[in-house]
Amino acid sequence: MIGLQLQNDTVTVAAYDDVFGEAARSAGLKIGDEIVDINGCDVSCAEDVRSVLNKDGQLPVNLTVRRGNKLTTLALTPRQTENGPRIGVYLRQGISGIGTVTFYDPEAGLFGTLGHGVSDASGSLLQMTRGSAYEAGVVSVKKGKPGEPGQLKGCAEGSGVYGDLFRNTPQGVFGTTRYGWEGTAVPTAAYGEIQTGPARIRCQVTGGTVQEYSVEILKIYPETRTDGRNLLLKVTDPDLLQATGGIVQGMSGSPIIQDGKLVGAVTHVLVNDPTRGYGIFIENMLEAAA
């Protein structure tokens, strides 16, 4: 399990403030809006917003926001608080989450995770400028049900950054680790070596131990497919089905092992059948990391 923090040079409205949120609501500011500038000053971090507010006080401010593919200008009157003027929203710069490490190359210090990209509020691939990785552990499990995806809820462990992220792609998130991981090296499988039939996935569901669980590879799609859906999987392990109901959020990146070789990673769950999901070929992840 690994914690991921991807950052970029955009500032997004994450939530309304419970007390002062009416200022933002009445101005038409919406969750998911990207703040481009305030009073003509470019915004690339939350501090840029605070700087203008502290300078102009309670005077109305003009916000240019990107909503989808359109730019909109909003007039907003900040509310005065004991900590200075506020526009009534919580701002987010980048995205945080958890996933599972798929592979680690000790010679290069390189690792890959998720097997799919991280998207911004508009659904587009997040244009990451920098990022950090942290050790993380599972604190609770929300079991998946048909129509209601489950989730591994995790939190960061330790006090420092464990690695640095350098690339967010449709085939996964990649970085370099400062410390590395212990484990047994396994060969990777070429596309032509992967077969339908029994396989194993490795993931951390409870406690701090990574365990293997049985799955079935039901279908293999063309190698050229780049959306992280190269394999159709079905969870067959009774222990995993009991614990999670199948594939859940937070398991993205879980390595898929077949005949002693790393063939890919778990990427998606079928919402209407959490026992089934998709995986990506390891070859596609390694190509994206190169």
Which residue stretches match the model-derived regions?
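PDZ-domain C-terminal substructure recognizer with occasional recognition of PDZ-binding tails
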Residues: I2, K30, R50-V89
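PDZ/PDZ-like groove recognition
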Residues: I2-I31
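Extracytoplasmic/secreted envelope proteins and their assembly/folding machinery
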Residues: T10, L29, A46-L53, I98, ...
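Second-shell loop/turn segments in exported
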Residues: D18-G21, V36-G40, I87-G88, P187
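Conserved PDZ fold ligand-binding element
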Residues: A24-E47, I256-D259, V263-T267
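Short, surface-exposed secondary-structure edge patches
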Residues: A24-G28, S51-N54, Y191-G192, T244-I247, ...
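PDZ domains, with a preference for the canonical peptide-binding region formed by the helix
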Residues: D37-K70, D273-T275, G279-E283
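Serine endopeptidase catalytic core focused on the charge-relay Asp
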Residues: Q80-G245, Q249, Q258-D259, T267, ...
